[in-house]
């Protein structure tokens, strides 16, 4: 696989993470530390799951491809619903400050990387090249998510978005989840 193809593939699978990180970034209670942890969580899981998928892809490709998309979509929909319900509550702390969310969202936005590993990277026989290709995909996801956090800080300054961030973010996450399930 050429570098340009790998870059476009990495960019494509990073878009879900970008959308989710925007929703996280506009949330009122999110801290800089939490944002950084989410960015690195998303990047790490993009790397790890694409590597894992490539490593065992030829064996399980036929049986597992549809399952990760369904699970990832459902998880993101559930998080979207939780975000909307958080908007109705008077809260002192954001749902995203719960440490388990780093893992849950990191894995759920990276499940497509597992599928890409199964289908696209599984032909790479050299473990070093597979590792480097997966690492490149994780790096691209980290950069894209960093840009999403920066962009969300500007979006958050728009008063109507700031006022309804939980609802907007929740609806966007539900739409992402539905996209993963049906498209």
Swiss-Prot record:
PANTHER family: MANGANESE EFFLUX PUMP MNTP-RELATED. This is Putative manganese efflux pump MntP 1. It is a multi-pass membrane protein. Belongs to the MntP (TC 9.B.29) family. GO terms for cellular component: plasma membrane. One of its GO terms (molecular function) is manganese ion transmembrane transporter activity. It is found in: Cell membrane. It comes from Clostridium botulinum (strain Langeland / NCTC 10281 / Type F).
């Amino acid at each position: 696989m050429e570098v340009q193809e790998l870059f476009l593939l990495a960019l494509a699978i990073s878009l879900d993470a970008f959308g989710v990180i925007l929703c996280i970034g506009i949330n009122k209670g999110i801290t800089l530390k939490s944002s950084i942890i989410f960015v690195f969580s998303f990047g790490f899981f993009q790397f790890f799951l694409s590597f894992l998928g490539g490593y065992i892809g030829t064996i399980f490709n036929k049986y597992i491809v549809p399952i990760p998309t369904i699970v990832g979509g459902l998880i993101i929909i559930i998080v979207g619903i939780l975000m909307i319900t958080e908007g109705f509550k008077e809260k002192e702390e954001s749902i995203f400050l719960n440490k388990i969310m780093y893992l849950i969202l990191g894995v759920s936005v990276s499940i497509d990387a597992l599928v890409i590993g199964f289908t696209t990277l599984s032909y790479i026989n050299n473990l070093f090249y597979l590792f480097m290709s997966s690492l490149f995909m994780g790096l691209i996801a980290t950069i894209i998510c960093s840009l999403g956090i920066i962009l969300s800080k500007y979006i958050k300054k728009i008063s109507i978005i700031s006022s309804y961030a939980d609802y907007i973010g929740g609806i966007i996450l539900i739409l992402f989840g539905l996209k993963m399930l049906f498209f």
